């Protein structure tokens, strides 16, 4: 009879097959199953295994290589799969209330399989449903059961054809009619059509629609959200006054039906206003708990934070999949060697390590951040339910909004660069569609622009940081926040006076070194950005121009540096906590160090310019430390990706399978494609009229 640990392992995950990757696994400094257990916990691992095995054993989820479906069929199949996911009961409300992280886990597991499927489910449950919870009142919660049971299907309609990032300029209107106690939704023209709305194209029956609220006195009360029926759930035909359609084929995620909608004087009950941030009485009087219009708008758009936090996790999953495939490939692909008779795995080359392993470290660091920021958001939503003070929610909401606004750019851009690097790392085989790099690249691409353009979002984070200097709190505590991400700024003047006095590789390998450097960097960029902004405002007299002219070399790098520090700080605390098993401390510590130094190395010029470091040797020592960490992590790389990898079926890449049989798997997949050995159906065109040269030459 096996030990309890062996029995637990067998429940958590299947044994990894023997094969060409076994040599690297044998050299690992830790047990990958122990890392799985620490990283996710048994409950989540069991949940993952259930999801993966369920998908693999259901013929509806089969995906033969090389099969391209017509757009309409792709949309149909994706909805059937979405429906099946709900039929399996994965969205168990009671279970997810006990462990909210399972919501994120489910989204990620489905996304590893197909983001069209995951996003269809997420937009319905996590975005549409969460907006009702976060922005509505108790009388709106009756819709939640209908959402869980798929009696209605939802979407989130904010963006319009002519406006996206500038939410205050949305033009859809909602005039209140006290005579009937209804709001009248209207699109003034086609440019005000709701656009790019996921699920709206073919399937949504209901939408959270953002519109400018007008009271009977003619005043515009700003952007508010309304629950609007779009289609009849029994027929899927549009409701009266609603014009709704599908946008067509996209670069990726074509199973997801993005659509548009216009409203022609559509009447909805007064109760359909999601009234957490503002309400209208039956007589038409407007009430809001917020004194400041901007604060109310921020609270109204708080649901955007959930979407952006979801995108952080989506991006991390894409990065993880690319890194898993590329590292397994690199550990089995042999090219060149010290002699003509010996070839070595390309993972043994320092250049390959330097190209890949920092992205592996980033995948771990950002994965941890995505989980923690998601749980922060859940706590904020719970605080709203139990009646936490408006001031407390505002403070937490502003901080989470700032983190989500910079977290999405950092995660999506890191994934974008990482996927491309991994595609190139595996050479020509990475260009073959069945190996998934093209799909990952296309599916990740919209993460950089939807739910807010990355460069615009970064301005919201820098505005948050600058406000700490511009608007000191009454009690004098300028730099405190509920999540403590800005608390280090209390030492702002002292940090600016610090310098990195050491210059050796060992000095950079001190786990506090990159954190201290990043704290200085954020303080330096905050000071530079504030000074630049003040100078611009003084010379131009316009706050609008001053902020725009402070972005490129000031506010933009400030927001990114602050976000990198936050991710690094959380990862460092996690990997150095007492809960880390002794056998995992070294490898996780190295991942934390590599992520920190790799990110920091991209700011070397600023560190020199600001005087934090000096001398040629200091910068070289940082580079040497990065290369040493890559060498130290090389033998652990395969085990590290094993700990975060899905099943082979879900990974869906012949060159990334766990057995490492690179060439056998790729050859088999190529031969399994439909028609691969058949003569071209258009072969007669090849044989007919052979003498074609110059036949159509111009006679002029």
Swiss-Prot record:
Highest rank taxon of the organism: Eukaryota
Keywords associated with the record: FAD, Fatty acid metabolism, Flavoprotein, Lipid metabolism, Oxidoreductase, Peroxisome, Phosphoprotein
CDD domains (alphabetical): AXO
EC annotation from Swiss-Prot or TrEMBL: 1.3.3.6
Any Pfam family matching the protein: Acyl-CoA_dh_M
Modified residues (N6-succinyllysine): 505
Compartments where found: Peroxisome
This protein's name: Peroxisomal acyl-coenzyme A oxidase 3
Protein's organism: Rattus norvegicus (Rat)
Lineage start: Eukaryota, Metazoa, Chordata, Craniata, Vertebrata
Gene expressing this chain: Acox3
């Amino acid at each position: 009879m096996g030990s309890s640990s062996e029995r637990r392992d067998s429940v958590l995950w299947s044994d990894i097959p023997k094969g060409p990757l076994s040599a690297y696994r044998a050299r690992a400094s830790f047990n990958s199953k122990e890392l799985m257990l620490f990283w996710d916990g048994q409950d989540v691992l069991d949940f993952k295994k259930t999801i993966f095995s369920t998908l693999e054993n259901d013929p509806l989820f089969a995906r033969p290589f090389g099969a391209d479906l017509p757009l309409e069929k792709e949309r149909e199949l994706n909805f059937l799969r979405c429906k099946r996911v709900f039929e399996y009961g994965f969205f168990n409300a009671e279970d997810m209330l006990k462990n909210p992280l399972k919501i994120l886990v489910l989204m990620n597991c489905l996304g590893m399989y197909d983001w069209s499927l995951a996003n269809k489910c997420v937009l319905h449950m996590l975005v549409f449903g969460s907006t009702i919870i976060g922005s509505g009142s108790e009388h709106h919660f009756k819709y939640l059961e209908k959402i869980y049971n798929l009696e209605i299907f939802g979407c989130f309609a904010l963006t319009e054809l002519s406006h996206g990032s500038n939410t205050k300029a949305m033009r859809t209107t909602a005039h209140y009619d006290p005579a009937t106690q209804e709001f009248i939704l209207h699109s003034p023209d086609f440019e005000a059509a709701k656009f790019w709305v996921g699920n709206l194209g073919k399937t949504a029956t209901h939408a959270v629609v953002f519109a400018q609220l007008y009271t009977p006195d003619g005043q515009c009360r700003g952007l508010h959200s309304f629950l609007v029926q779009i289609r009849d759930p029994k027929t899927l035909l549009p409701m009266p006054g609603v014009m709704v359609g599908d946008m067509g084929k996209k670069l990726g995620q074509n199973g997801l039906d993005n659509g548009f909608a216009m409203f022609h004087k559509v009447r909805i009950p007064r109760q359909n206003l999601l009234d957490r941030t503002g309400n209208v009485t039956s007589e038409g009087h407007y009430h809001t708990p917020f004194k400041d219009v901007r604060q109310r708008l921020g609270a109204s758009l708080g649901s955007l934070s959930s979407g952006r936090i979801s995108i952080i996790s989506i991006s991390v999953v894409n990065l993880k999949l690319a890194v898993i495939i590329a590292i397994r490939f690199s550990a089995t692909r042999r090219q060149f060697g010290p002699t003509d008779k010996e070839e070595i795995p390309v993972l043994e080359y320092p250049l390959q390590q330097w190209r890949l392993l920092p992205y592996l470290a980033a995948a771990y660091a950002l994965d941890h951040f995505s989980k923690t920021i998601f749980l922060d958001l859940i706590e904020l939503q719970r605080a709203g339910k139990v009646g936490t003070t408006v001031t407390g929610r505002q403070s937490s909401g502003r901080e989470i909004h700032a983190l989500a606004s910079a977290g999405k750019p950092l995660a999506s851009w890191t994934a974008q660069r990482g996927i491309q690097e991994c595609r190139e790392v595996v050479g020509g085989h990475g260009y073959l569609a069945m190996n998934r790099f093209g799909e990952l690249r296309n599916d990740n691409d919209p993460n950089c622009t939807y739910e807010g353009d990355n460069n615009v979002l970064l301005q919201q984070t820098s505005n948050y940081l600058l406000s700490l200097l511009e608007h000191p709190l009454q009690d004098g505590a300028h730099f405190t926040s509920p999540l403590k991400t800005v608390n280090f700024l209390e030492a702002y003047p002292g940090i600016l006076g610090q310098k990195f006095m050491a210059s050796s590789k060992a000095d950079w390998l001190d786990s506090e070194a990159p954190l201290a450097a990043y704290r200085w960097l954020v303080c330096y960029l905050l000071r530079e950005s504030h000074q630049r902004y003040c100078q611009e405002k003084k010379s131009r007299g316009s706050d609008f121009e001053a902020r725009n002219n402070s972005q490129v070399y000031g506010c933009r790098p400030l927001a990114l540096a602050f976000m990198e520090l936050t991710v690094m700080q959380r990862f460092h605390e996690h990997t150095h906590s007492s809960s880390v098993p002794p056998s995992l401390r070294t490898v996780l510590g190295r991942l934390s160090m590599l992520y920190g130094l790799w990110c920091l190395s991209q700011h070397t010029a600023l560190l020199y310019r600001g005087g934090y470091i000096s001398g040629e040797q200091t910068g070289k020592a940082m580079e040497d430390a990065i290369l040493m960490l890559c060498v130290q992590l090389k033998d652990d790389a395969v085990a590290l990706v094993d700990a975060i990898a899905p099943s082979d079926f879900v990974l869906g890449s012949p060159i990334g399978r766990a057995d490492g049989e690179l060439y056998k798997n790729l050859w088999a997949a190529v031969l399994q494609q439909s028609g691969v050995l058949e003569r071209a159906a258009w072969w007669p065109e090849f044989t007919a009229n052979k003498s074609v040269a110059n036949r159509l030459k111009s006679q002029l």
